[in-house]
């Protein structure tokens, strides 16, 4: 978080936090309630978000759920939805933290290579994350959707 980064930087230079760093921390703290509210709304609506995003993805990419597709059959479709749920959870972590560090450290590094080795169409996973953004945006206020949208975009971009 901005708090940890500011402290680590100041300590590395054996100095007190600067006025600018303190202002950034104050802004981070004051926006905390908003970030927590957004994360709570996404958490409370996670099943709806994942299901509707999956429906949108499978409608847009029927090849994924057709015979021979990576999400063909009930078990593989459930695996695909599980992955979307995982990315939604990571997104809520990023929102709460106010940056993408938890997303990077917990679940994005190495993902592209893993999906390639499994033969999973990475663009379909990224499209699923974008579909979750669309569903979440319909649940959130415009301001909250803009805040959360950056995290969905980050994950989709990291997968693409």
From Swiss-Prot:
Organism: Mastigocladus laminosus (Fischerella sp.)
Cell division in keyword set: no
Post-translational modification remark: Contains one covalently linked phycocyanobilin chromophore.
GO biological process, one term: photosynthesis
Name of one Pfam family that matches: Phycobilisome
Known partners and oligomeric status: Component of the phycobilisome. Heterodimer of an alpha and a beta chain.
Chain residues that bind (2R,3E)-phycocyanobilin: 80
Gene3D superfamilies: Phycocyanins
Source superkingdom: Bacteria
Main location: membrane
The family this protein is said to belong to: Belongs to the phycobiliprotein family.
Cross-referenced CDD domains: APC_alpha (cd12125)
Functional summary from the UniProt entry: Light-harvesting photosynthetic bile pigment-protein from the phycobiliprotein complex. Allophycocyanin has a maximum absorption at approximately 650 nanometers.
Membrane topology designation: Peripheral membrane protein
Localisation: Cellular thylakoid membrane
Name used for this protein in its record: Allophycocyanin alpha chain
One GO CC term, this protein: phycobilisome
Modified residues (N4-methylasparagine): 70
Record's keyword terms, sorted: Antenna complex, Bile pigment, Chromophore, Electron transport, Membrane, Methylation, Photosynthesis, Phycobilisome, Thylakoid, Transport
């Amino acid at each position: 978080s901005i708090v940890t980064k500011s402290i680590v930087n100041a300590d590395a230079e054996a100095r007190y936090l600067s006025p600018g760093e303190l202002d950034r921390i104050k802004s981070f703290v004051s926006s905390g309630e908003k970030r927590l509210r957004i994360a709570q709304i996404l958490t409370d609506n996670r099943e709806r978000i994942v299901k509707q995003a999956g429906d949108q993805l499978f409608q847009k990419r029927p090849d994924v759920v057709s015979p021979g597709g990576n999400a063909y059959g009930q078990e593989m479709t459930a695996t695909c939805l599980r992955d979307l749920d995982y990315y939604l959870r990571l997104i809520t972590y990023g929102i709460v933290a106010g940056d993408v560090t938890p997303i990077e450290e917990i679940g994005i590094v190495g993902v592209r290579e893993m999906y390639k080795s499994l033969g999973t169409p990475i663009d379909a996973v990224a499209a699923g994350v974008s579909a979750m953004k669309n569903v979440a945006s319909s649940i959130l206020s415009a301001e909250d959707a803009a805040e959360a949208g950056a995290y969905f975009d980050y994950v989709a971009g990291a997968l693409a």
